[in-house]
Amino acid sequence: MLNKIYYSFSMVAFVLSAVVAFYALRFGDVFTQEGIQLLFLDLTGAGVTLMGLLNVNSKHSLFTIVVASLVLLVVFYQMNASHIMMADSLSSIQDSVFWKESFVWSSRLVLMMMAWSLIQSLCVPIFFLVHRFFGTKKTNDPLI
């Protein structure tokens, strides 16, 4: 259940970041380069998220979850770096409030998803190992 929520929030982050990237392509200089990089990262992240959503209930779901969360961690980290580069030039633009607010919310969501990716990639294997070795064991003793 948490994995579906994680992947859904990831997809929302990629859609919002794509809106920011398309809007950034209207401006020149740093925004064009970072906008193209954000679009590439959005497509990569959306593909990984779609793969995670399709394989969330499969036999190898633990491996898929860990690999997808590590890949998404790298993608969100790069998106955060692009947002930092764009924030340096953002103060010189006197444009719409929508641009600035969508940028702020996209940055916050990317940071939240970066933290969630890190937590998920670390906690899921630990939870699996604890459950595997210390979970309830079935016995074949008919007296119990």
Q: What is the predicted function of each stretch?
A:
Residues S61-H83:
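Hydrophobic alpha-helical membrane-insertion segments
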Residues A18-G28, L50-V56, F76-M86, P125-F128, ...:
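Transmembrane helix-loop junctions and nearby membrane-interface residues
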Residues L41-T64:
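Canonical alpha-helical transmembrane segments
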Residues A13-A21, G45-T49, V71-V75, S117-V124:
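Helical transmembrane-bundle signal
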Residues M1-L2, R132-I144:
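Short, charged juxtamembrane terminal tails flanking transmembrane helices
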Residues M1-G47:
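N-terminal signal-anchor transmembrane alpha-helix
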Residues R26-L39, F76-M112:
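Interfacial non-cytosolic loop connecting adjacent transmembrane helices
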Residues S10-V15, S91-G135:
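Alpha-helical membrane-associated segments of multi-pass integral membrane proteins
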